[in-house]
């Protein structure tokens, strides 16, 4: 588990403080900075040092405490969703003294205990916002330098669904959506990258536009690896988003390694991100993108006829937004996000399931109309964390197509399926 000490106050220098004395934390002064460290299984320690800008003729008694408001402010300023570290994960002495004639107290030692397995599996960064104040308000604090955030980053683990052969994963919507700005994101790990003129589907969302009262199925998005027409490397995501024309990513994917894939449409400006880096940009062909409820988003195959062969496509942390997420928001919240975050329309963690039955297309591979022939199938069902959307499901072409659900996998971007940092 890694930790991060951060303070967001540019150019604070205690030597420049004039007027009445001020109280602050020595570590929280200067330019905005971060210090990372590893907390081993047997725990670790970190120290902070309360300081005043000018010596006093008397002892100054201090209180060191956890400031939840400082964490709220940090999250707002940095587009993060850090959650408060439980008090079972840390210990420190809350009292300190700056002796008369001195400007610093003895260092305050914070003992940190590693995150539990369950805390790691939430995906949330657990943060400890440490602050200092004078007892009895005997001295004002130096605003912006009186607190810092100690952030314990989890090693992200999850149970993972694997799509194989003649099957696909589908997240349907409760209603059709017409959106001028939106975001789709997922964690993705392909077991291998095909060679040759073979197309496989990372994800697709069937949409439509209306022309003369007729629905034309051409909107939404499709993200492919490879192209049946050839000429596109199978490691490069290609396809079309909101009728923007075929685009090809400049960033190759790697087999058996976790990637964060995102499409952001901001009022018609489209960006494909791979691990927070721009794969390509494009312009939407329409003022708004329409998504069809019965199709939602499909993963692994365009249909149950299958084109994955022996591949296994692994997914988790699937999210669909009615807002354009910034690259900072994408990068800071890869492994978890609060289910009540504004603009979050659907959130399928895919980390647990129930077994049940669902209606899927019968003779047709795509639900493009309400009267599409449907048939009932046994399946896995995956809850939407927001409660706004129906369960996601797996459609398989035959009972011989297996369900594969692998527990406790490290899903960190850049790590292999076996949990090793890729070279």
Located regions from the model:
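Bacterial Sec-dependent N-terminal signal peptides
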Residues: 1-40, 143-154, 423
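Short glycine/proline/serine/threonine-rich loop/turn segments at secondary-structure transition edges
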Residues: 116-127
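Extracytoplasmic low-complexity segments
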Residues: 145-163, 336-423
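Extracellular glycan-recognition modules
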Residues: 156-234, 325-329
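Extracellular, beta-strand-rich glycan-interacting domains
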Residues: 180-192, 308-333, 345-358
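Short tryptophan-centered beta-strand motifs in secreted/extracellular beta-sheet-rich domains
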Residues: 186, 256-265, 270-272
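Short, aromatic/His-centered strand-loop micro-motif at the edge of beta-sheets
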Residues: 238-260
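Flexible glycan-contacting loops in extracellular carbohydrate-active proteins
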Residues: 282-314, 339-344
């Amino acid at each position: 588990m890694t930790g991060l000490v951060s303070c967001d106050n540019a150019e604070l220098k205690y030597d420049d403080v004039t007027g009445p004395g001020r109280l602050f934390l020595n570590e929280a002064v200067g330019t905005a900075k971060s210090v990372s460290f590893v907390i081993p299984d047997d725990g670790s320690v970190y120290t902070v040092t309360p300081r005043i800008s000018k010596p006093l003729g008397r002892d100054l008694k201090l209180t060191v405490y956890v400031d939840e408001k400082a964490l709220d402010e940090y999250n707002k300023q940095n587009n993060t969703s850090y959650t408060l570290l439980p008090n079972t994960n840390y210990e420190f002495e809350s009292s300190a003294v700056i002796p008369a004639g001195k400007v610093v107290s003895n260092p305050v030692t914070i003992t940190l205990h590693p995150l539990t397995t369950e805390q790691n599996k939430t995906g949330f960064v657990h943060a400890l916002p440490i602050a200092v104040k004078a007892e009895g308000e005997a001295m004002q604090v130096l605003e912006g330098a009186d607190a810092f955030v100690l952030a314990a980053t989890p090693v992200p683990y999850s149970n993972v669904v694997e799509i194989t052969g003649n099957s696909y994963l589908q997240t349907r919507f409760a209603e059709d959506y017409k959106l001028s700005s939106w975001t789709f994101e997922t964690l993705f790990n392909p077991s291998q990258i095909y060679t040759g003129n073979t197309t496989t589907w990372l994800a697709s969302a069937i949409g439509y536009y209306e022309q003369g009262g007729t629905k034309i199925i051409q909107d939404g998005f499709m993200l492919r690896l490879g192209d049946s027409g050839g000429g596109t490397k199978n490691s490069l995501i290609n396809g079309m988003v909101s009728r923007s024309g075929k685009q090809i990513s400049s960033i190759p994917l790697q087999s058996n390694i976790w990637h964060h894939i995102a499409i952001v449409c901001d009022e018609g400006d489209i960006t494909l991100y791979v691990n927070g880096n721009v794969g390509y940009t494009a312009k939407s062909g329409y003022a708004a993108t329409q998504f069809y409820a019965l199709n939602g988003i499909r993963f692994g195959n365009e249909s149950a006829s299958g084109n994955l062969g022996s591949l296994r496509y692994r997914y988790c942390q699937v999210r669909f937004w009615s807002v354009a997420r910034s690259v900072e928001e994408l990068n800071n919240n890869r492994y978890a996000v609060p289910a009540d975050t504004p603009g979050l329309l659907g959130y399928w963690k895919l980390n647990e399931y129930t077994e049940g039955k669902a209606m899927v297309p019968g003779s047709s591979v795509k639900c493009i109309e309400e009267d599409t022939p449907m048939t009932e199938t046994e399946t896995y069902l995956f809850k939407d964390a927001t409660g706004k959307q129906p369960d996601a499901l797996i459609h398989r072409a035959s009972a011989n197509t297996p369900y594969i659900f692998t527990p406790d996998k490290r899903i960190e971007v850049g790590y292999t399926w076996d949990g090793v940092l890729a070279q």
